[in-house]
Amino acid sequence: MCTDVAFFSLDCLATWLGGVCSTSDLRLPNFGSLNVTVGILFNPGSGVLLTTAPEVPLAFMIDLVCEPVGLVDFLTTGVSRLETEENGPVEFVSGIADEPILACSAPERVFEATPFLLFFRLDLFVIASLHYNYGQYSSFWSLL
């Protein structure tokens, strides 16, 4: 469920992305190479899992899901390896599924510590905050 949409300046985005993050290179049949950045930013009392992608592939994506590892079958994937103080090394898998869906998966212990998934649409600098209910999808049905 989409709980909040906010607009941020480039400076603000740079501050947020200053946390732990890593970039995956995804190769799509219709779009060529796509860079997706996945990261973790820990705020006092809560964790944040974030992912970014450019506008063009997102224009045809109707859903954004976040699941524990192993529950999503991707058509194309990229792995981001993040080092966190709380969880140690964590591997995130970002990919495009056949719905089409932009998805990110991570170990369950990460989801337990990161109740919010942040989705960035870089062309408009929009951040949609999606509340993650453990064991359920968090879906973002509208890009705006």
Curated annotation (Swiss-Prot):
Keywords recorded for this protein, A-Z: Signal
Residues in the signal sequence: 1-22
Highest rank taxon of the organism: Eukaryota
Additional comment: Almost completely overlaps VHS3.
Name of the protein: Putative uncharacterized protein YOR055W
Lineage: Eukaryota, Fungi, Dikarya, Ascomycota, Saccharomycotina
